[in-house]
């Protein structure tokens, strides 16, 4: 059995006096693509932020490859091997595509360099002809691809994607899905927070559902596909 890359246990997270997460727990193994699914406001983004240290939990812990990372600063967590693509992408709009990629370049926590820029352009062929374009002039879908590619340039042990299909045209969502399926096929480990269930059903290997700040379901993706009652109860809009 493959090793656990990220383990989240019993997280309680508050915004002020309001509790948002209640004992949240999940784990992602090496090579898995895990979809964290739920309706708007269910706690998906807060879970991602808690993992990255952007919303520190009051209780619980987060471990990366067996090492405790909860309680550390976000930049230390990133250096330990987590790559986070937030919902707003946070590209550098005044720089070129290639400059954005170079800015994101660093070796992995064990000195590995699995994502040289040549490989990035092989996996993201739409970016190479745009490499000299100013990033702020890209379409939303191109910016999303750039944000994912730039994060991979940091050689993360785990790629975290917060709502990668949000606000994109259906044809662009399809392209992003194809890209994520390719990442899965080459063994990347990915955790996706998404409201768009149909987007994830075709690319994830496993699914966890969060509802009102609590984990209510976790299974292989085929089991979720076969369980219409669960989909209707927690994911239907």
Region locations from a protein language model:
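ABC-type ATPase nucleotide-binding domains, specifically the catalytic core motifs of the NBD
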Residues: 16, 72, 97-115, 123-128, ...
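The feature captures the beta-strand-to-loop junction immediately N-terminal to the Walker
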Residues: 37-39
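Helix-to-loop junction immediately C-terminal to a conserved catalytic motif
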Residues: 52
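ABC ATPase NBD coupling module
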Residues: 56, 68-89, 93, 113-117, ...
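ABC ATPase C-loop
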Residues: 151-152
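Catalytic Walker B motif of ABC-type/P-loop ATPase nucleotide-binding domains
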Residues: 159-163
């Amino acid at each position: 059995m493959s090793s656990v890359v990220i383990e989240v246990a019993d997280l309680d997270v508050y915004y002020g006096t309001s509790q948002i997460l209640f004992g949240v727990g999940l784990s992602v193994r090496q090579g898995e693509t895990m979809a964290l699914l739920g309706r708007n406001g269910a706690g998906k983004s807060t879970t991602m932020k808690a993992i990255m240290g952007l919303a520190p939990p009051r209780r619980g812990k987060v471990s990366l490859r067996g090492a405790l990372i909860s309680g550390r600063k976000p930049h230390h967590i990133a250096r330990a091997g987590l790559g986070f693509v937030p919902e707003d992408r946070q590209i550098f709009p005044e720089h070129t595509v290639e400059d954005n990629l170079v800015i994101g370049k660093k070796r992995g926590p064990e000195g590995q360099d699995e994502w040289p820029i040549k490989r990035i352009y092989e996996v993201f062929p739409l970016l190479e002809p745009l490499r000299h374009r100013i990033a702020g002039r890209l379409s939303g879908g191109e910016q999303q691809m750039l944000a994912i590619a730039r994060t991979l340039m940091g050689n993360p042990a785990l790629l975290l994607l917060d709502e990668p299909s949000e606000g994109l045209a259906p044809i662009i969502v399809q392209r992003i899905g194809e890209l994520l399926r390719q990442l899965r096929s080459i063994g990347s480990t990915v955790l996706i927070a998404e409201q768009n269930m149909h987007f994830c059903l075709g690319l994830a290997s496993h699914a966890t559902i969060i509802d009102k700040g609590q984990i209510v379901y976790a299974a292989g993706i085929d089991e979720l596909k076969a369980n219409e009652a669960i989909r209707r109860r927690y994911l239907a809009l």
